[in-house]
Regions:
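Boundary-proximal intrinsically disordered activation/regulatory segments immediately upstream
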Residues: 1-64, 148-149
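Short acidic-hydrophobic, aromatic-tinged amphipathic segments that line or gate anion-handling sites
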Residues: 4-8, 76-81, 167-176
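Short glycine-rich anion-binding loops that position phosphate/pyrophosphate groups of nucleotides
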Residues: 38, 59-60, 84, 104, ...
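RNA substrate-binding interface of SAM-dependent RNA methyltransferases
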Residues: 46, 100-193
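Short, aromatic/basic amphipathic alpha-helical patches
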Residues: 62-74, 220-221
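Glycine/small-residue-rich loop that forms an oxyanion/phosphate-binding "nest" at active or ligand-binding sites
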Residues: 69-102
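Active-site/ligand-binding-proximal alpha/beta "capping" segment
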Residues: 187-227
Length: 227
């Protein structure tokens, strides 16, 4: 860990982390995202997703020290003056540590037989909760369609509770998605659907399509539905 304490808001690391927390464009350009909090950073370090650097509040709890002790020697860990770190943090109460990680370069899993498709979900909390539920349910991959919220926005990452480090999350155009889903039963999760979820056969290769909070699924997504 560097012993020099960062005090300037113009510091390169501080500016970059701030941009990653607030700008989707910066996340795309830098191919990176920020994860805040001891649990998330620890999950990231254990996952194999490449960490670029960590920022730690000068005054931080013992829980943060426990995370820092797991860092490889080659990983830059920089101390940030307390007020400056608090201004950078996206949470109301700073947890004292923030990690910048590369966006995972996921590939399509072999033998795809259980996927989740999210179409036009726009609430970050809902998206993050759905991602962690997908991981818990054993989904092999989550596909995001055009118009869905940025999966690596800070509120989504927090709500995902580490799913971002373990679950492949891919944003695909409609044409590619149709090819990938060929051969799978695509179920639309619809409150007014004729088939009960208890009657659906999810043991067959399938994908579950969930629409947005306000508008449901788009016409393009509806074209994918087989059941």
């Amino acid at each position: 860990m560097t012993q020099e304490i960062i005090t300037s808001p113009q510091n390169q690391y501080v500016q970059e982390a701030r941009a990653l927390l607030s700008q989707p464009k910066a996340r795309r350009k830098l191919q990176a995202f920020a994860a805040e909090g001891a649990r998330l950073v620890e999950d990231g370090l254990r996952s194999g997703v490449r960490a670029r650097y960590l920022l730690a509040r000068t005054t931080h709890p013992a829980r943060v020290d426990a995370v820092l002790s797991q860092c490889p020697e080659t990983l830059p860990v920089l101390l940030v003056e307390d007020k400056l770190f608090d201004s950078l943090a996206d949470t109301v109460t700073s947890q004292g540590i923030l990690g910048v990680f590369e966006l995972p370069a996921w590939n399509l899993p072999d033998g795809l037989n259980f996927a989740l498709i999210l179409d036009q979900l726009r609430d970050p909390g809902n998206l993050g909760a759905t991602l962690r539920s997908a991981e818990a349910a054993g989904a092999q991959v989550v596909f995001l369609t055009p118009g869905t919220a940025d999966a690596f926005a800070p509120k989504v990452v927090r709500s995902g509770m580490g799913a971002h480090f373990r679950l492949p999350i891919l944003t695909l155009d409609w044409e590619t998605l149709a090819v990938v889903l060929a051969g799978l039963n695509v179920f639309h999760a619809d409150m007014e659907g004729e088939l009960s979820c208890w009657e659906a056969n999810f043991r067959l290769p399938c994908a579950l399509l969930i629409g947005g909070e306000a508008e449901g699924i788009s016409p393009a997504a509806a074209n994918l539905v087989t059941r």
